[in-house]
C-alpha cells in the first residue's frame, strides 16, 4: 500500500459533509425505517469506496476498512456536535429530532465531540500505519479502551434513561459500533507486541528495587489507592446509598450523578465494576516484577478513562444539563481538580508502563519456567 491510500481515506471521511446535508433533507420526507436503510447503505458504500481506493494493492489488515468507515462516522459526529452548538445548521437537524434524540443530551454532545476529534485522529493514524505497513498496536489498544467505554455507557444509557421510551429504529445503527470494536480489539491484541531489547543486567537491576526505591511508582500506588476509594464512593452514590456523606456530595459537589438521563449513573457503575478491579490488578503489577501484561491492560484502561472523564466533566458543566444537575459554581474548582486528577492518573500509569517497561519484562528464567 502507498501513502495515497491513507490520503484517500481522509478525503473519503470529509465526504460526510455533503452527504449529511443531503441525507438530512431526504430524512425529513421519509419514515424512520427508510432513514435507517439509507444510513446503512451509505456506510456500506463508504466501505466499498475504501476498497476501491486500495484495489491495486489491498491491505493485509482488514481493519483498514473498519477505520475508513469509522473515520467517516467521526466526521458525522463532529458535524452533529457543531450543529448542536449552533455553529452550523441544516446538516443533521431532522435526524437528531427523529432518529437519535438522545444525542441532544449533554453526554451525547460530549461523546460526539470526542468521537469527532480524538477517535478521528486515531483512525487517521492507524490507517496511515496500515498504509505504511507499520505497527499501531499501542494506539490501537488505547482506541479499543476508549470506544468500548463509550459504547458500554452510551448504549445502556439510551435504554434505561429518560429517552428509553423514545428508542427509534436508528438505534440499531449502534450494533456495528458495538460489535466491530470487540472484533478489532482481539485482532489488535493478537498483533506482535513490541520487543524490548534491554540487557539482562538492566532488567535485573530495575526489578531488584523495592517499591520504596521507586518514588514515581510509590506515588502511583498511593494515587491508585485514593482512586479506588473515589470509585467505590461514587459507585455507592449511583446505587442510591442513603449515607449522609453521599447525600451531601451529590447535593453540593456532583448533582449530575442524579441526572435522569442515566449516563452518569451507569458511568459510575462502570468505574466501580471495571476500574476498581483494574486498580487492584495494577497495584499488584507495580509491586511484583515481571508482570508483562501490565502495559496492555494499562493502555486499554487509559483510553477508556480518557473518554469517560472528558464526557463526564463536559456533561456535568454543559448548558444542556438541567441547572439543578449542573455542578454548583462554588464547587467547580474542587470538582475539576478531583475529576481531572482521576482522568490523568491512568495516562501517567500508561506512560510509565510503555516508556519505562524494564520492571514489567519477564526474564528469560521466568519464561523457561512457564
From Swiss-Prot:
Residue stretches spanning the membrane: 3-23, 34-54, 62-82, 110-130, 139-159, 166-186, 218-238, 268-288, 331-351
Keyword Lipoprotein: no
Membrane topology (UniProt): Multi-pass membrane protein
Cell compartment(s), UniProt: Lysosome membrane
Keyword Cytoplasm: no
GO-annotated cellular components: lysosomal membrane
Pfam families assigned to the protein according to its UniProt record, in alphabetical order: EBP
Domain called EXPERA: residue spans: 60-185, 216-350
UniProtKB keywords: Lysosome, Membrane, Repeat, Transmembrane, Transmembrane helix
PROSITE patterns on file: EXPERA
Function, in words: May function as sterol isomerase.
Homology family: Belongs to the TM6SF family.
Annotated protein name in UniProt: Transmembrane 6 superfamily member 1
